[in-house]
Amino acid sequence: YILVPLFNRMFRLQAGANDELIDNCDLPYYMAASDAIFIQRKDVLNSANIPLAFLFHKVAVGPDTGNMGELLNNTGNPTFCPDNKADIIRALEEARQLAAWGKGEVNYEYAMENMSIKKIGKMYVQLYESTSLK
């Protein structure tokens, strides 16, 4: 978070995006203004960014790895091979098209049905009850 912005400034590199971190207070505005949420992480198995994107009525695009890839594939959201630039571009283009077709609304409905606090809470209770010693 520190070296990349300094490197970019030192060599006057511009990657097309601001290298400053987005303040948490401003994040909802960025989310609302976007058509799709791009999850660029390469080496993680899961991400809270997917439910976040769904709850903001957005298409989520992420790597086809771990739980992220499974959830994105199961919900019809684009995935990509993180080491393949052409595949990333394809997934982003697919996300743009899906957003225009209203996929974000479908994602929101999915999140409300399957990712609500009430439902997840019940699942935790069931898990603890099934594994507790009696």
Locate each region found by the language model.
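Short acidic alpha-helix that forms the nucleotide-activated donor recognition element
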Residues: 22-34, 51, 55, 69, ...
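Short hydrophobic beta-strand element within catalytic cores of glycosyltransferases
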Residues: 39, 53, 59-62
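Conserved acidic donor-binding loop of glycosyltransferase catalytic domains
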Residues: 62-64, 70, 80-82
